[in-house]
């Protein structure tokens, strides 16, 4: 998919790089081959990368909802990448989805230009265009700024690590599928080497590249879920380990997994912080080639539609990525469910109380884990951290009257 399609058709013209910002976005409804009709948003920003923006807006959206940015692979379109299952999951779990789309004028095979310095630098090119799409969503919908995530396949996966490194202040989580580390390549020639056999650097060297994406930044960094097929002959599986090395070092943790298990029969590893917060995870899909793993069906953990580079392997990557982000289920924390006089504690789920009270859900975790799971924003994180301590386990309560979480059972704001 990627190796034969990475060549750029033409370098951008100065005119395209300096496209104008219009006062109001133009909205166009399109369907194409989309499972759900996507809406195109034009004039969403200065758009220096000359990308197109499509969005999926589920019905009945609550205030302060999450946002997922999903980046297609080479030769694909926004509509085609809906087959990954994100729109359907957004309908069920109530989050918005933005699908950036490459144009052939930028790259003849519609690959995001993850190897071009002018497109992978903060404040420039395609990276800035994608960030402006997020800004547009925040301006026009009720988006929780602490629950914005990015994922992608192949060239879109490489661009995913670009966004994680250059905009850690925007994205709370990232999930590259069949991609590699940030700045694995900075030219078309080096891109081929990066893809296969791959580039070997020390964790510290990779981490320095990621930190250089936004020099001097000291805020929360995005957690990352890294997926790869063991039989991927387009982007070598070695890239998965290099990405682990980059982002574990970026987070200041070691490269020894704290959890090694299987999910759906496939190897899964988790790398945690000193206080037990999952920061990096990997899924290695044994025997899978180059593509996004899906599991078509109607089960709670099933999603996606098989197609070109959308591979039915009986595990839906989008579902498990959503769990890791904390926008599907409990994001790996502990939840207490009360029904009558019976209290049950379970992991990785968020459940509803049946008692008559102002709140409808309660879950206990450290203040840091509440933030990682997306229940509180940065301001609330700092308030609660100062109030209780960042590694202190506290209950939070979901209150419909607040359309969000609070530390007070009477539903007073944080």
From Swiss-Prot:
Q: Which SUPFAM superfamilies match?
A: alpha/beta-Hydrolases
The entry assigns this protein to a family as follows: Belongs to the AB hydrolase superfamily. Lipase family.
Role according to the record? Specific for poly(hydroxyalkanoic acid) consisting of monomers of four or five carbon atoms and for P-nitrophenylbutyrate as substrates.
Q: Which GO terms describe its molecular function?
A: hydrolase activity
In terms of InterPro entries, this protein maps to: AB_hydrolase_fold, Esterase_phb, Plant_Biomass_Hydrol_Est
User: What are the boundaries of the signal sequence?
Assistant: 1-37
Official protein name in the record: Poly(3-hydroxyalkanoate) depolymerase C
Instruction: State any GO CC term.
Output: extracellular region
EC number(s) per entry: 3.1.1.-
Which keywords does this chain's UniProt record carry? Hydrolase, Lipid degradation, Lipid metabolism, Secreted, Signal
Q: What domain of life does the UniProt record list for this protein's source?
A: Bacteria
User: What's a single GO BP term from this record?
Assistant: lipid catabolic process
Q: Where does it live in the cell?
A: Secreted
The main enzyme category here is hydrolase
Task: Give the active-site positions.
Answer: 154
Instruction: List, alphabetically, the Pfam families matched.
Output: Esterase_PHB
- Organism source for this protein? Paucimonas lemoignei (Pseudomonas lemoignei)
